[in-house]
Design a protein with these regions (language model features):
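Ligand-binding clefts/hinges and TM-proximal coupling segments of bilobed small-molecule sensing domains
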Residues: 24-26, 73, 149-167, 202-208, ...
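A ligand-binding cleft/hinge motif common to bilobed small-molecule-binding domains
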Residues: 100-108, 153-155, 182-211
Length: 251
């Protein structure tokens, strides 16, 4: 059996002033770029989320640190997950960083940086559920976040008729709590962050199905930016800065 791997445009919220539909600013010939636009989906704790109107999370802090190393400001564009790659392809953002798994299909549309984090797809069910593993999920309603690898591979394994898709995964948890779906497939750290807040309602199954590599997506052919991002990631790995950020959010 294939292992699990980890739409309408959502409202756009920008740190700073970015006009709707505006492309990422290109510097004048010979001028240094002073700002990069990062698109993300801030509904994916602990990687990206909003707290009191402020963007926080592993990806947010990593992106800001990369910006510091490159000597540029990083501006955040908050959009639906399935709009991230099209936004990078169109030039409306310089890069996407959103707990995004590297897949062969996605590599046809964008270029990916070096891996900065790995994750595991996991299954979450109601605390009193009889579901113990993947073999019990056939014929059940399964919730996923639209456009994620969980969506892609669950659709393949269980059929489209079994899927319930949500632009915000937290909406899936609310649906499961009210009995509308039977299980959710989501990245393990996201599952932990949500279940910790409501352990009386949900439980995470012990079986892990696959590891996934997270990386930053840039427009195909933008080797200059990709090389700079890769250098920053490599430095953050070697000097412990990346681990410090991850450890801050994942205990």
């Amino acid at each position: 059996m294939k292992k699990f791997l980890s739409l309408t445009l959502a409202s756009i919220m920008v740190l700073g002033l970015v006009a709707c539909g505006q492309k990422a600013a290109a510097p004048a010939s010979g001028a240094a770029q002073t700002k990069l636009i990062m698109c993300t989906n801030a509904e994916f704790p602990p990687y990206e989320f909003k707290d009191g109107g402020e963007f926080k999370g592993i990806d947010v802090e990593c992106a800001k640190l990369i910006g510091e190393k490159l000597g540029v400001e990083v501006e955040i564009l908050d959009i639906a997950f399935d709009s991230l790659i099209p936004t990078v392809m169109s030039g409306k953002a310089d890069f996407a960083m959103a707990g995004m798994t590297v897949t062969e299909d996605r590599k046809e549309s964008v270029d990916f940086s070096h891996t900065y984090q790995t994750a595991v797809q996991t299954i979450v069910v109601p605390v009193d559920s009889a579901i113990q593993g993947v073999e019990d999920m056939y014929g059940k309603k399964i919730g996923v976040q639209t456009g994620t690898t969980g969506d892609i591979y669950c659709s393949d394994d269980f059929g489209d008729e079994s899927m319930e898709r949500y632009s915000k995964i937290i909406d899936g948890f609310q649906a499961m709590k009210s009995g509308k779906i039977d299980a959710i497939v989501v990245d393990d750290q996201v599952a932990k962050a949500i279940v910790e807040q409501d352990a009386s309602s949900f439980k995470i199954l012990e079986t892990a199905y696959a590891e996934e590599d997270y990386a930053i997506a840039v427009k195909k052919g933008n080797s200059d930016l990709l090389n700079k991002i890769n250098s920053a990631i490599d430095e953050m790995k070697s000097n412990g800065q990346l681990k410090a950020i991850v450890d801050k959010y994942i205990k």
